[in-house]
Amino acid sequence: MDLLQEITKDNTLSNALSSFLSFYGPSGLSQAMQLYTDMNQEYVCRTKETLSIVRIYEIIYLEIHGHNIAVHTVHGIYQKYGSLSDELKVLSRYGFIKCNQSVLVAVHKIRSIQQDTVILTDDTYLHMSRSCAPKVIMAIAAKVSQQEL
């Protein structure tokens, strides 16, 4: 039996899905499924001595000093070795953008922007460079317009 037939046989699930679709539409369901998938993706922090695995959705921002990257998460700070440009290639699809020369930030963790400062949900204040400001502001505007849908 295929999955769609199983869903229609379960009245509770079928009703919940119908309600969701009538309120948010098919694109809302697609976005919800993508968000669920993204929230469960894992990110590896590796140094010579340690190996840590964190969920991408729990990362607040990454900060680089030389080739040492500090990965700030809701559970603490993890270390890894690498380059910020390589990390951006991996994390951009999950809503990470460059805030300045040495910081990548998760757009969903930005609470507000005040002049050249990005304020995060954990009350961290990060400098936003003039060269990165347009992309950060556009990403926040897109986030706000998605939330209004």
Where do the model's predicted regions map?
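N-terminal regulatory/sensing modules of transcriptional regulators
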Residues: M1-M33, L149
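Conserved binding/recognition cores within well-folded domains
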Residues: P26-M128
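Short, charged, intrinsically disordered terminal tails
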Residues: I140-L149
